[in-house]
Structures are given as structure tokens and as C-alpha cells.
Regions:
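N-terminal membrane-anchoring alpha-helices
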Residues: 1-71, 273-275
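Accessory terminal regions of nucleic-acid processing enzymes
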Residues: 19, 236-275
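Catalytic core of membrane glycerolipid acyltransferases/transacylases, capturing the structured
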Residues: 33-60, 68-71, 77-127
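Flexible, glycine- and charge-enriched loops at secondary-structure boundaries
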Residues: 51-52, 129, 171, 175
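A generic local structural motif
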Residues: 75-78, 136-138, 183-184
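A cross-family acyltransferase "interaction/gating" segment
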Residues: 100-119, 144-238
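A Trp-anchored, charged/polar loop motif used as the substrate-binding/catalytic surface
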Residues: 128-141
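Exposed, interaction-prone extracellular/peripheral surfaces
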Residues: 141, 185, 269-273
Length: 275
């Protein structure tokens, strides 16, 4: 709609709208998050519903400024199998709760925060073994009566040519997947998770930066969503201590990555630059 404006001006305008939208929504969400602390179940349920509506409004406003300052063509397949009433959450590192404004929003929206101990830490404190999984399992008790899905970014970092070469990745379009995080989630919530939503994103004109998005330089985004079952043998194993289970789990994750790499190959052919 504002395509007649220079990209730099559109970027500044979009950034301003994003900040204003976030601050206004937070000003309403924060009091509700405090009220939600009261140990009154009906009140907590009501606050949760209102907070979710605020989050949906925030997303709608973000979609609005993206349409205003840009003209992205979305090609999405598979979203019809997603359930609007389901809960799609990210497992977040505990340190992220301290991110200004957004950390409180994540907490208020019941995004589970996880704290994982490194091998070096466990070597110094063996008594802590298993406590991180148990803590996460307790944090997820609230989801036993609520449909929930957990997002996990297996590559763990943004793909660059340098990182791809450094890893000597066997995949054309992907970095090597890190299976520890998803194994941790399945160990903590295995009884509640039976399938995974495999999301693949392709940018025909190359991976954009956040500034590219703000300034209206993103032309097209191709998204493919696939529902895949989680093998029962991948549930309930001890990824940290059981070497056989860890090898089998990594093999399963690698097979998912091989399929994703082939899909990206096809998407690159079907949606070349400028398509």
C-alpha cells in the first residue's frame, strides 16, 4: 500500500508501528498477568483467555503493518491440518524470561521455560542429574488437560555459508540438526505428544534480514507444513545416559532432515529467484 515510499522510510515506519503495538498490548497484558497470580482458578482461566486474545490482536496488528509497508506473497500448504484450539508453544531457555517486556509476555502466555544442565556442570554436580527434566516435567503439568504443541528449532542458529562449510554439513540447504533439545522435550512431555508439525520455509529470493522485512523487501515466502508421527520408541528414553537410545534418536532426526533437504531441493526448483 505504501510501496511508493523509499524502502528506508518504510522500514522506519514499520519499526515504529511494531514498537507502539508491542508497548500498547503490553500495557494491557501486564496487569492481567499480575491478576493471574491470584490462586483463584476461574480468575486464572479468564485472565489466560484474555491474554491470548491480546496476543492474537498483537499478531493481527503486526500483519497489518506488514501489509501496509510491504506486499508479501504467501504460499502456504498444510496449515489446514493445524488446530486453532491447539496450543502452539515454544520451549524457551530460562534466561529468556529476563528479556524486557517480551519475557513477561511469554510467561503470561504459559510458554514453558526450561533449564538444561551442561555435561560439564553435571560432572561437577552429579546430584543434579535428571533434575532439569523433572523440573520441566512439573512445569508442563498444566498442559495435561490442554492440547499443546512445542516448537523447537533444531539447527539452533541461523544458516550461513560459513557455518555450513565449518560444519561440513551433509545437507545442501540445512545445518546439522541438534537432537538434544527435542529429546529433552519428549522426555519431559512424551505422554502428551504423539505427532510433530514439520515446518519448512523457503525464500525464493534468498533469506531476508529483519530489516528487509521491515522495509518491504521480502517479496515471497513459501511455507510447507507436514504432520508426522513420533515413533513410540523415541518416547521415554534417556538421551543423556543411554548411548544406544541417543544414537537411534539422532538417526531418526537425521532422517527427518534428509526429507526436509529433499523438499527444499524441490521448492528451489519450483520457486526459483524472481518466480
Amino acid at each position: 500500500m505504501l510501496s511508493f515510499l523509499p524502502h528506508s522510510l518504510r522500514g522506519v515506519l514499520a519499526g515504529f508501528l511494531l514498537v507502539i503495538n508491542t508497548l500498547l498490548c503490553f500495557s494491557v497484558l501486564f496487569p492481567l498477568s499480575l491478576i493471574k497470580l491470584l490462586p483463584i482458578k476461574p480468575l486464572q482461566v479468564l485472565c489466560t483467555r484474555l491474554i491470548i486474545r491480546i496476543a492474537e490482536f498483537w499478531i493481527s496488528c503486526n500483519s497489518g503493518w506488514m501489509a501496509l509497508t510491504g506486499n508479501i506473497q504467501w504460499d502456504i500448504q498444510g496449515r489446514e491440518r493445524l488446530d486453532y484450539d491447539g496450543w502452539y508453544k515454544f520451549f524457551l531457555k530460562q534466561e529468556l524470561i529476563w528479556v524486557p517486556i517480551i519475557g513477561i509476555c511469554w510467561w503470561a502466555l504459559d510458554f514453558p521455560f526450561m533449564k538444561r544442565y551442561t555435561k560439564a556442570y553435571l560432572a561437577r554436580h552429579p546430584e543434579k542429574a535428571g533434575q532439569d527434566v523433572e523440573t520441566t516435567r512439573k512445569a508442563c503439568e498444566k498442559f495435561k488437560t490442554t492440547p499443546v504443541a512445542v516448537f523447537n528449532f533444531l539447527e539452533g542458529t541461523r544458516l550461513t555459508s560459513a557455518k555450513h562449510a565449518e560444519q561440513q554439513s551433509p545437507y545442501r540447504h540445512l545445518l546439522k540438526p541438534k537432537s538434544g533439545g527435542v529429546a529433552f522435550v519428549l522426555d519431559a512431555m512424551g505422554e502428551q505428544l504423539r505427532s510433530l508439525v514439520d515446518i519448512t520455509i523457503h525464500y525464493p529470493d534468498g533469506s531476508p534480514t529483519f530489516w528487509d522485512l521491515l522495509s518491504g523487501r521480502v517479496r515471497k515466502v513459501v511455507v510447507r507444513c507436514q504432520i508426522k508421527p513420533i515413533p513410540t520408541e523415541m518416547l521415554g528414553g534417556d538421551y543423556q545416559q543411554d548411548e544406544v537410545f541417543r544414537a537411534n534418536f539422532q538417526r531418526w532426526v537425521n532422517s527427518l532432515w534428509e526429507e526436509k533437504d529433499l523438499l527444499l531441493d524441490q521448492l528451489h526448483q519450483d520457486y526459483p529467484p524472481g518466480h
